[in-house]
Amino acid sequence: MATTSDFRNGLCIEFNNDLYTIVEFQHVKPGKGGAFVRTKLKSLTNGKVIDNTFNSGVKITTARIERKTYQFLYKDGAGYHLMDNNTFEQLDLDEKAIQNPLLIKEGQELDVLFHQETGNFIGCELPPFVELKVTYTEPGLKGDTATRALKPATLETGLQIQVPLFIDNDEIIKIDTRTIAYVERVKTDI
């Protein structure tokens, strides 16, 4: 059990017969009336985000979540196949279980979340950044613009994003998995 003073981003709670993680919270002390906490909760079962207000001091049941690191092996018609790095146990997931499947490539590690009491699968979390290779992009011309211009690029997983003009084919770039946006070019040792 936890109270609203224990709220923090990422805390998993049981609420309305579902598991939620706190995405955002704000303690509010109005001039009139009691204090309360405004929250944004993300369902771990279906991914929907809801807004909810808790009165200050309310007791909430926290959910125990177990994180295990799995390695992505391959994708086929049955879904995505992952392997636990410690026990070598394999886990088969459908495409809906992974938030942005085009951000993962073979051999990449990701965290898989399980409910500790029941052992049920909850979801997958990608690392904050991934590095992917650009397979195709139009050549950018120097001096084409005075401002920061972007062009489309196709990555090795099939994902298409906007990249700066100086990015060429076969370069490796870093992508933010939360915003699915270009971050920087990865320096490669030659």
From Swiss-Prot:
InterPro entries: Elong-fact-P_C, NA-bd_OB-fold, Rib_uL2_dom2, Transl_elong_fac_P/YeiP, Transl_elong_KOW-like, Transl_elong_P/YeiP_cen, Transl_elong_P/YeiP_CS, Transl_elongation_fac_P. Pfam families: EFP (PF01132), EFP_N (PF08207), Elong-fact-P_C (PF09285). It is found in: Cytoplasm. One of its GO terms (molecular function) is translation elongation factor activity. GO terms for cellular component: cytoplasm. The keyword Cytoplasm applies. The keyword Transmembrane does not apply. Pathway: Protein biosynthesis; polypeptide chain elongation. One of its GO terms (biological process) is peptide biosynthetic process. Keywords: Cytoplasm, Elongation factor, Protein biosynthesis. Involved in peptide bond synthesis. Stimulates efficient translation and peptide-bond synthesis on native or reconstituted 70S ribosomes in vitro. Probably functions indirectly by altering the affinity of the ribosome for aminoacyl-tRNA, thus increasing their reactivity as acceptors for peptidyl transferase. Belongs to the elongation factor P family. This is Elongation factor P. It comes from Amoebophilus asiaticus (strain 5a2).
